[in-house]
Every structure is written in structure tokens, then in C-alpha cells.
Amino acid sequence: MASEKSDLEKAVSTEEAADIGKDGEKPTTVKDIPNVADLTQANMRGLRMPEILARLTPEQRLELETRLRRKIDWRLLPMIILMYILNYIDRNNIAAAKLAGLPEDLNLDPNASEFQTAVSILFVGYLLMQIPSNLFLNKIGKPAIYLPACMMVWGVISAATAAVTNFGGLIAVRFFLGFVEAAYFVTWLLVLLELLVCVMMNTRKELGLRTALLYSGALISGAFSGLISAGITQNMDGARGLGAWQWLFIIEGVITVGVSFFAFWILPNFPRTTSWLSEEEKALAVWRLEEDIGEDDWIDSEHQSLWTGARLAFADVKTWVLLFLLFGIVASGSVTNFFPAVVKTLGYSNVITLLLTCPPYVLTVITTFINAWHADRTGERFWHIMLPLVVAMAAFILAAATTSLAPRYVAMMLMVPGVYCAFVVALAWISNTLPRPPAKRAAALAFINAVSNASSIYASYMYEDRMAPRYVIAMSVNCGTIFLSMVSATVLRFMLVRLNKKLDQGIYVKGAINALPGTAAEHGFRFKV
């Protein structure tokens, strides 16, 4: 044991000797480093280019990167956007169904808040399954099979909503819908992190825009689900003896099931388990990940149990700060679950109301991409979250302060972009802040997303009809949760700035990719602030 320690100290001393003189400071010694064995192991498996890539000329590697980028982009992006459009529509079409007569047909008791309970119960199932689902996928590494299967099941459940005849049936269907849909969002965020980093020119720095691409599915569905719902509501009510709300669930559920069949052979897996990549392309994909974070994630994930990642995530204080940040944003964004009902308070017919829900989402798509693009271009995260939150808070205050039509619709136009612009960049900030190991990253993403969506459980009861048109309680709570996010973002930025200063000095930082002491500055890893 003593000889092993001696050899390790010699290795570190050699590394230190190479680094002394670069900045005039002596790096941290091996005795100052926690978990030295793990650190040395990471360094031993670090930046070593695979032989299959080392023999390529620069021109050949550029050609290989171009081919890899095209393969992944053409297979991945269109399908995940389409899947998320359908995921979001199937989850939130109950808001449009309310305008189409669902509460009346099922004899829901407004005094008992039965409709609100039907909305909130989905997020109970969503919360319970989020972490197990994503840790399971991180272990098996087969999203190309797992996700389409989940999609097929949630499409069937969504279509089955048309058959419910009472409150109990609606509750059961909504619970299981949330249970199955929990697999989707964070899972695809993990796939993005693995696959898109392989093809991006600046890896982690571009994660904000790629996250915006993923989340554009939700925004597009918000923009066009109103149009679809308006068409069904106006033209299919009473067709074949079914109400408009029943056709809404049937049509959208059948489309989801149909798309899931195509997803089975279109979707990719993680880099090492993607069958339609050549051996050279797999090696390059994994190497791009190693270049970005300093080591091979797969080695970590192969040796970690499903719950090891959860333990690591819970032990990191940054996970909890990120949790409060995302919880505040998602809680304020719960207004989108009832957006048709909120817009209905402007006094227009059901069809016009559904059409009026579209412009805020169109604006959201545009502003979210601009904000995410600029966040990636500058490498900055904090202000790209704070400024949209200021806009959202102002919109909520305006909505609660007046009953005038024009100012209230302006508030509705601004509250959705403000929340989503901040949300997309905050999601990217999670992966930027918790880059490794992969099991920890998976657990953190799932845990944060699950708990933050739990806010929708109580938020459902703040948008009852009796609270219209200003929804003062809801708008006030939204302002409070936005303030919570602002404080959390400020605390996180302060923490990351301090950690980056340590990295500048070559000091070991747990969770960062330092290799051996004194080499962090050379490899260039920094937490995004």
C-alpha cells in the first residue's frame, strides 16, 4: 500500500514539475486531494485518442465529423421535436377539452374542484416515475427502443380518455398518462447531451441552443394545438355520437401511436450503442465527449448502479440550488396548463379563444431561440435567465392589476416567453454545472424535473373559474416563485465563480474534470456562469 502511494506521489510530482512556472504557483499536492484513487483512474483513462482515429488525416477527420453530424441531426432532431409536440399536446389537451364541454359531459363538480384534481393528478404519476425511468434508461442505454414503446402506450392512454364517463375514470386515465409520459423529457435531454455534443463544434457551450431545439416541440405544440383544437371543436362536435372533446383525445392519441411506429427505426441510441453508426463514427462520437469533459463517461456509467447516481446528485449542494431555480420557473410556468381558460376571460367565444392562444407561443418560439443562441454565443447563463424572469414577473403583475382587455392580452403575450426563455437556458445550466459522472447527471436531471413539475399539483387549484378574470392569487404566487428563481440563480452564479477561480489555480474541484492537479487550466474546463 505504501509503495502504491509512493508511485502516485511520484506521478503527481512529475505533473507538478511540468506545470511550475506557467503561472508561478505550485499546484495542489496529492495529499490535499479527496479520493485520489478515483482521480488518478480518471486521468489514466483520459484524453487518449483511439487508434482508429489517430491514423486519420485532418481532412479525413473533418469529413468523418461532417458525416456523423448529418447522420445524427437528420435522424435525431426532426423526430424528437415531433415526439415532444405530441407529448405536450397529449398532456395538456385537457385544457382545450374543458372549453369543448368535458366537465359538463362528465358531470364534474366545480365546487369540489374535480377538474383541477384531474389536471393535477397527472403530475403525481409524472413525479413518481421520473427518477426510476431515467436511471433505468441510463443503465440499459437503449432509448431507440424504450422511448417509442413509452410513446405508444401514452398514445393509447390518451385516446382512451374519450371513453371515460365519470370523474373516477378521468382520474385513473390522467394518473397513468403522467406515469408513462415521465419517460420522455429528461430522457431526451440526456440523449441530447450524449449525441449532440458529439456533433457540435463547441460542445457544452452550444447546449442551450440544442435544448431550445428540443423544447421547441412544446412551444410549437402550444402555438398550433389551439388551431387544431379550434378546428375539431367547430367541426366535429356530435360526429358519430361523440362530443368534440372526445374526438380531440381520439385524433391526437391515434396520431401519437402512429408516429411511435416510425420512431422505433428512426431514433438513435447513445453513441456506443447506436447500430447505424460505423465503428469510426462511434469512436469519433465518444472522442468528442472525451474532448469536451476530459474523460469517457461510459466507463463511469458501466460501473455505477441505478441509485449510485442519485446518491451522488443528492450529496452535491449545486443540485439543490438548481432544484430551487427550476422549481420557481416551472411553478410560474404552470399558467400554460390553463392558458386557454386564462385567455377565455377576455370574453371571446371558444373558437376565438383557442385562436388567441397561438400568438403568445409563436412569440415564445422566436424569443426562446434568440435567447438560447445568444447564451451559447457568449457562454453566459445568469443574465439570460434573469432578464426573461423580470419580463415574466412584470407580465404577471400587469395581469393581476387590471381588467382592461388590451393590457391583459399584452401580459399574456409576455408571460409565456418570459418563463420559457429562462427555462430553456436553466435546463442547459444543469448539464453545464453537473457534467459528470453520467449516472449523477441523469439522476439530477430527473430529480430536478420531477420535483419542479410537482408545483403543477398545487397550481391547478389556483385557476378555478371563481378566481377569474384576474387570478390574483395565482399571479401573486407566480411572482413569488420567480423571485425564488432569481435568488437561486444569484447563489449558483456566486458558487460557480468561486469554483472557477479554484480551477484557474489548478486546485482540485469535485465534480469538475481536473485530471491531475495543475492541469485544469490546460484542458480548459470551466463551469458556465
What spans do the regions from the language model cover?
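Intracellular terminal tails of multi-pass secondary transporters
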Residues: 1-86, 92, 100, 264-299, ...
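Extracytoplasmic gate region of multi-pass secondary transporters
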Residues: 95-96, 308-373, 427, 460
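Extracellular/periplasmic helix-loop-helix junction of adjacent transmembrane segments
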Residues: 95-128
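Helix-breaking motifs and short loop linkers at transmembrane-helix boundaries and internal kinks
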Residues: 106-107, 132, 141-142, 163-169, ...
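Central cavity-lining transmembrane alpha-helices of secondary-active solute carriers
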Residues: 119-135, 358-370
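Conserved MFS/SLC helix-loop-helix module at the cytosolic interface between two early adjacent transmembrane helices
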Residues: 128-169
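C-terminal ends and interior cores of transmembrane alpha-helices
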Residues: 152-165, 178, 390-403
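Glycine-rich segments within core transmembrane alpha-helices of 12-TM secondary carriers
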Residues: 208-242, 249-256, 445-459
